[in-house]
Amino acid sequence: MRSALAIAMAISMSAATTAWAQTAQTPAPAAAPAPAAAPAPAAAKCDNPNALGVARVVEIDTTGGPGFGFEHFKAYDFLRDHEVVLTFDDGPWPGHTTAVLKALAEQCTKAVFFPIGKHAGWHPEIMKQVAAAGHTVGSHTWSHKDLSKLNEQDGKDEIEKGIAAVGIALGNQPVGPFFRFPALRHPPELVKYLGERNVAIFSTDMDSFDFKMRKPEQVIASVMKKLEKHGKGIILMHDF
């Protein structure tokens, strides 16, 4: 069995609105081995009585490469009502990732990061900060190519090189067996390959589309509207 940790937060809609509004105002200052389980986040004292916090830690059995996120996968759902998982793609990146880490720390909560391999190689010190803060680290290919436009072997190479690069950036530490496809495009042959590798696939329930919006308030309003509709879910954001 392969397993890794996802962080589920139980939040009220009003608390999330307040907390995310505060967060948005923070200025931005050869193939890999089979992934092993990510370390459990270290417990830390929270000095913010109004923080979002963490409701529970979910251990996910990744045997067979299950898919999560109702945008593409309907069979599995590990969240309870009023729980969300915060996920961040495309980092690590100076200013952006560090601002996200600061905001998460202020809210005493955790997230799942899906870094791009070459970005991790450029900024291993930031990658180590992500892991040291107790967040779960998966992978997001080597260079964020649309894998649906590559042949099968090139797609596998993108996946494996990305996993390896993140592991090296972490100081040759295991990478959690979680993967997100670039642009959320899932070639069937690579879905099958990840299943054979026992790597879980993360799609999303709520895409923030933060890369399309200039104002934090717009992102907050969009996410909260979707959260009010669905009541729970995996939220996709970016730290690049």
Predicted stretch roles:
Residues 96, 145-171, 185-232:
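Alpha-helical scaffold elements lining the catalytic groove of polysaccharide deacetylases
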Residues 1-85, 102-111, 230-240:
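Terminal accessory/targeting
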Residues 88-91, 114-118, 141-142, 180-184, ...:
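Active-site-proximal beta-strand/loop segments in catalytic clefts of secreted hydrolases
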Residues 3, 10, 58-63, 127, ...:
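Homeobox/homeodomain signature
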Residues 48-154, 161-168, 172-176:
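Active-site beta->alpha N-cap acidic-glycine motif
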